[in-house]
């Protein structure tokens, strides 16, 4: 588990690289990458936190979710963007099943309209029920879990993009590929 300082830095980086690069005047390329040295210089000048390569490596090593990738002289958020970016990986055949955790309130809309990206570029799908439950529990104490017929959806022209953190991205998914599993209780 990360200490509070690293969590705060990680959340700030996520906000900048996923949603608001303009707060530091960062320019993201089409894949969401920005210059590492520029980010560090502006981050350290603007925030009351210290960021360097060692700090980022500690965040990456201690986090169960791989949120960031250092690629040569650039850094990017791996997924979760609300600013328009292209997936780094080509569309790939997904596993037979993927999963999505959500709130009961959202589930009523999802059952009719399918999965839509809402304020993001892509819908995020998990490779396992436990991760979907964890994601859904952020929005509802008893999240609704959907099992996605991913391979069937792919055969019907839906493109799936894998990430390095066992999250799959899809632009949207019609309701016919979703199977309501159940509501899960958050474990103590």
Swiss-Prot record:
Say yes or no: keyword Transferase present: yes
**EC number(s) from the headed UniProt entry:** 2.7.1.-
Q: Please provide the Gene Ontology terms (biological process) for this protein.
A: tRNA splicing, via endonucleolytic cleavage and ligation
Query: What name has this protein been given in UniProt?
Result: Probable RNA 2'-phosphotransferase
**Taxonomic placement:** Bacteria, Bacillati, Bacillota, Bacilli, Lactobacillales
A Pfam family reported for this protein in Swiss-Prot or TrEMBL = PTS_2-RNA
Q: Is this entry keyworded Transferase?
A: yes
User: What is the primary gene name for this protein?
Assistant: kptA
Q: Could you tell me which InterPro entries the record lists for this protein?
A: Ptrans_KptA/Tpt1, RNA_2'-PTrans_C, RNA_2'-PTrans_KptA, RNA_2'-PTrans_N
Q: Which Gene3D superfamilies match?
A: 3.20.170.30, RNA 2'-phosphotransferase, Tpt1/KptA family, N-terminal domain
Q: Which residues form a coiled coil?
A: none
Q: What role is this protein assigned? A: Removes the 2'-phosphate from RNA via an intermediate in which the phosphate is ADP-ribosylated by NAD followed by a presumed transesterification to release the RNA and generate ADP-ribose 1''-2''-cyclic phosphate (APPR>P). May function as an ADP-ribosylase.
Record's keyword terms, sorted: NAD, Transferase
GO molecular function list? NAD+ poly-ADP-ribosyltransferase activity; tRNA 2'-phosphotransferase activity
Classify the source by domain of life: Bacteria
Quick one: signal sequence residues? none
Protein family according to the UniProt entry: Belongs to the KptA/TPT1 family.
């Amino acid at each position: 588990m990360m200490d509070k300082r690293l969590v705060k830095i990680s959340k700030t980086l996520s906000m900048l690289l996923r949603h608001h690069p303009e707060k530091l005047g960062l320019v993201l390329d089409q894949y969401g990458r920005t210059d590492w040295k520029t980010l560090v210089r502006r981050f350290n000048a603007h925030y009351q936190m210290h960021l360097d390569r060692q700090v980022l490596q500690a965040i990456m090593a201690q986090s169960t979710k791989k949120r960031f990738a250092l690629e040569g002289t650039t850094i990017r958020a791996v997924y979760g963007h609300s600013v328009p970016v292209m997936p780094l990986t080509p569309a790939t055949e997904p596993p037979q099943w993927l999963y999505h955790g959500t709130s009961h309130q959202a589930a009523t809309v999802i059952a009719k309209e399918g999965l839509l990206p809402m304020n993001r570029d892509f819908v995020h799908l998990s490779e396992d029920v436990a991760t979907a439950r964890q994601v859904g529990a952020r929005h509802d104490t008893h999240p609704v879990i959907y099992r996605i017929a991913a391979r069937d959806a792919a055969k019907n022209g839906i493109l799936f993009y894998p990430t390095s953190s066992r999250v799959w991205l899809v632009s949207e998914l019609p309701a016919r590929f979703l199977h309501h599993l159940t509501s899960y209780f958050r474990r103590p």
